[in-house]
């Protein structure tokens, strides 16, 4: 099974929710591992990692610097029932087996490992232009819409504009020196309202498509018994 948490913008709580779910699964006896999580130094997210089994990241030297990537082979070898993989749109370092993290996820799913992942709407290929129109930002890292189509479940982490701005002002999203800049740019109330609407529409569209597919598949599988 493949589940994706979608967010309208950074800081809505996708990573936190995934870790929350990992704790719930662990308590229910599920073999869950953290394949990759991006805490962004947020205290709440860091605290949620406590008590969860984390697969060490792979250290790679690239252009004279040590960088860390998700260790795909280690996950495949451990073969947990469920793995948490954050930052679905991430581009892997040059020389990695797959160019994109979503391709790593496909490999994990093919190996029979359940995956929970997360992405913000600006990284979805078909919504890229819409987000650019709303916020004036073009994002280079994108995932094809097919990745969302392949998901068994797409869940929107929804917050009101007021809740999100309060989180930002309280220092729960960015460091203090970045807060004002964010409020003046991406985190303007009118931007958030439009991005929120976009995220809600996208998830509604995905659910509708899934229901349509299930009806078609169900009809094919109906046996008429006398």
Segments from the language model and where they lie:
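Long, charged amphipathic helices and adjacent flexible linkers at domain junctions
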Residues: 179-225
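Conserved P-loop
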Residues: 2-77
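Conserved ATPase-coupling elements of RecA-like P-loop NTPase cores
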Residues: 87-102, 126-129
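Loop/turn-to-beta-strand initiation segments
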Residues: 31, 79-82, 111-117
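Internal gly/pro-rich beta-alpha loop/helix module
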Residues: 117-180
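Substrate-engagement module of ASCE P-loop NTPases
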Residues: 100-120, 143
């Amino acid at each position: 099974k493949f589940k994706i948490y979608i967010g309208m913008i950074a800081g809505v709580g996708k990573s936190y929710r995934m870790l929350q779910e990992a704790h719930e699964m662990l308590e229910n006896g599920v073999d869950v591992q953290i394949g990759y999580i991006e805490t962004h130094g947020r205290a709440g997210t860091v605290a949620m990692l406590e008590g969860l089994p984390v697969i060490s990241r792979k250290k790679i030297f690239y252009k004279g610097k040590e960088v860390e990537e998700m260790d795909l082979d280690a996950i495949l070898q451990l073969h947990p029932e469920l793995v948490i993989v954050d930052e679905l749109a991430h581009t892997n370092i040059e020389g990695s087996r797959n160019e994109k993290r979503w391709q790593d996820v496909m490999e994990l799913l093919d190996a029979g490992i359940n995956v929970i992942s997360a992405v913000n709407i600006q990284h979805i290929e078909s919504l890229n232009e819409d987000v650019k129109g709303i916020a004036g930002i073009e994002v280079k890292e994108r995932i094809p819409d097919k990745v969302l189509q392949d998901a068994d479940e797409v869940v929107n982490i929804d917050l009101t504009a007021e809740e999100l701005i309060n989180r930002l002002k309280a220092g729960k999203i960015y460091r203090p020196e970045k807060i004002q800049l964010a409020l003046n740019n991406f985190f303007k109330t009118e931007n958030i309202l439009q991005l929120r609407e976009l995220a809600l529409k996208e998830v509604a569209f995905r659910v509708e498509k899934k229901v349509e597919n299930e009806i078609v598949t169900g009809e094919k599988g109906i046996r008429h018994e006398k």
